[in-house]
């Protein structure tokens, strides 16, 4: 029989337990996802779906199912962006507003706990992270999906030029600046139009030339192309990393008489906005030279986030060191990484994320359940290369730049190196639709496989 005192103690204990559980739920997660971008949101949904569908105890008899709130997502951004849409924005086919949703709207509270903060530091030896406010969040398993840092400050004078509305310097590589690109393309009637691409790592390495081809086509359609000298300065040794598609791009430049002047191993290092001059460094001999411009589309350098580069998770390049097949950290087995923040040796695109995510999720689930990591990522990535209004080359390839085309079996009459309207509408209409309605809504989009998830052996 309970006494009054024991009842009070019981009730008090229940409140204390509830308080402790509430605090625990907000600071500890079985799975913690760092990043609320394309990779983070997609993979969080897939993790939830996988662990909900396959609920059973692991070999040690431990319940490995995930309950609502046991997956945490850490990201301080207010908005989530469909960044592949910024090329369309720059071409006048969309707007930044159409590529934007509030991040919280993509993180249903009945599944996930959103921590609206940025990460300050990672402590994988202690299974925790620290946010900018100083909050510590611990985890059993960590998924790194933090994206890449766009370093505008590395090019002297670039930020100042972009912030000046009277200076014809633009970029599609930021939600802050992408809407200004198309108006400047419209206003340019003559002179020198320069488009740049930095050396080194870059998210969507085809985008710097996509916007160039779209601008060139716009000027041609509006009968001013003959008045404009169009140049592309790239810090890379080739126009595109895969020879098959690089050759196709060069072929259409020559055969269609587009007359874009392509300069290799020349990197933009400074923008003199008031003088309308761009300073380049030749990467072969280190020499500097200037070029005047009437329109400059500049692509900033990119690098790993500092909190990753300075952590024990990083490889020598500053990205998360992972096994290129399993996406598991090579340093801490309870850590996985996908997307732009990972050291996976493939092009950093959203298409790559769609192929990496189910592999990572299956291997995480297998690891939690004491199984072998049987899913393998083959490096698949894709770059829908806009070459003009109504035209697109659909580049798809694996590790080592080996082409792997979705329509390869139909290549006799559907060559993916030939710009086609069908491919154009995939980029312009279909991909944005499936992104918002499947990929970040419920995680049920698997890239080249469409709505059909891959199946991996369990052993």
Curated annotation (Swiss-Prot):
Q: State the EC number(s).
A: 1.8.5.-
| Cofactor field | FAD
Major localization listed first in the record, in broad terms: mitochondrion
The EC category is: oxidoreductase
Instruction: Identify the domain of life.
Output: Eukaryota
Swiss-Prot/TrEMBL keywords: Cadmium, FAD, Flavoprotein, Mitochondrion, Oxidoreductase, Quinone, Transit peptide
Q: Is Glycoprotein one of the keywords?
A: no
Q: Where is the transit peptide?
A: 1-24
Compartments it resides in: Mitochondrion
Q: Which residues form the active site?
A: 204, 383
Q: Does the keyword Transmembrane helix apply?
A: no
Q: Name one GO biological process term.
A: glutathione biosynthetic process
By its UniProt entry, which InterPro entries does this protein fall under?
FAD/NAD-bd_sf (IPR036188), Sulphide_quinone_reductase (IPR015904)
The cofactor note reads: Binds 1 FAD per subunit.
Give GO terms: molecular function aspect only. FAD binding; quinone binding; sulfide:quinone oxidoreductase activity
Q: Name one GO cellular component term.
A: mitochondrion
Q: Where does FAD bind?
A: 35-39
The record's family statement is: Belongs to the SQRD family.
> What the protein does?
Catalyzes the oxidation of hydrogen sulfide, with the help of a quinone.
Looking up PANTHER family in the UniProt record yields: SULFIDE:QUINONE OXIDOREDUCTASE, SULFIDE:QUINONE OXIDOREDUCTASE, MITOCHONDRIAL
Protein name according to UniProt: Sulfide:quinone oxidoreductase, mitochondrial
Give the gene name: hmt2
